[in-house]
A protein has these predicted regions:
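Conserved non-cysteine loop/helix-boundary elements of the Radical SAM core domain that shape
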Residues: 2-100
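Terminal RNA-binding accessory module
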Residues: 86-232
Length: 232
């Protein structure tokens, strides 16, 4: 959900077809209708005519939405764009000093990182997640092999290679392969990466049928998956 900026003044200058209020209402609607949905966005600092208040409005938007991922840039002129034509005609000026753009971008990045960490620890930590295995982690070693994959919100997840063959046979250990789906429990939640305990290999169909029960699953200190005090 690209926002570009958090102030209506900037959105109008950028010719975006939404207001801050409409954008936030849409975010609220999606979160109500799709529990667990997360958002990524694009943000620009230092667009022509951006004031300090415009910048603060962008920071407050980040804090309110709590994006999972963000692509953040300083504004630079591109030929044939609306802003380029305005500057060429002398209507606008690319009036912010590069140092101000850089400082504002740093503010945006730090605000994003702070809120993303807060949200990840709130919505990811200790949760059961489905992960698509990408392959071995770059930090994997022969002594400590680790895999990496993506959650259903595209967050990177790192975990050991061994897990149960399926949810009925947790003690039947297999080694995960690229392309497998694995159910994990999140142990550590950072801004862009999760660390997890792999529980068992699964399929999309199987997981979709059991996902509504995920809140009932617990992992004890021995790594045994239990539901309602009964070993699954």
């Amino acid at each position: 959900m690209p926002a570009q900026a958090g102030s209506n003044h900037m959105l109008d200058l950028m010719r975006r077809n939404h207001t801050r209020e409409a954008y936030l209402e849409l975010i609220k609607h999606f979160r109500t209708k799709i529990p667990g949905v997360e958002f990524s966005t694009d943000l620009i600092s230092g667009f022509c005519g951006e004031t300090e208040q415009d910048h603060l409005d962008t920071l407050s938007l980040i804090q309110e939405v709590e994006y999972e991922m963000a692509f953040m840039f300083t504004y630079s002129m591109r030929e044939r764009t609306h802003a380029w034509h305005k500057v060429e005609k002398g209507v606008w000026t690319d009036d912010l000093h590069p140092a101000i753009k850089k400082k504002r971008l740093a503010d945006i990045v730090q605000t994003y990182r702070d809120t993303a960490l807060k949200r990840s620890q709130k919505v990811d930590l200790n949760q059961i997640k489905l992960v698509l295995v990408d392959g071995y982690s770059k930090r994997s070693t022969r002594e400590h092999p680790q895999m990496t994959g993506r959650t259903d919100t595209f967050k990177r997840c790192v975990f050991n290679v061994d897990c149960g063959s399926d949810y009925q046979h947790l003690n039947n250990t297999i080694q995960l392969q690229e392309g497998d789906y694995v159910v994990v429990q999140i142990n550590e939640a950072a801004v862009s990466t999760l660390k997890a305990t792999p529980l068992f290999r699964t399929t999309l169909t199987e997981f979709s049928q059991m996902k509504w029960k995920a809140k009932d699953f617990k992992v004890d200190f021995n790594g045994v998956l239990r539901r309602e005090n009964v070993i699954v």
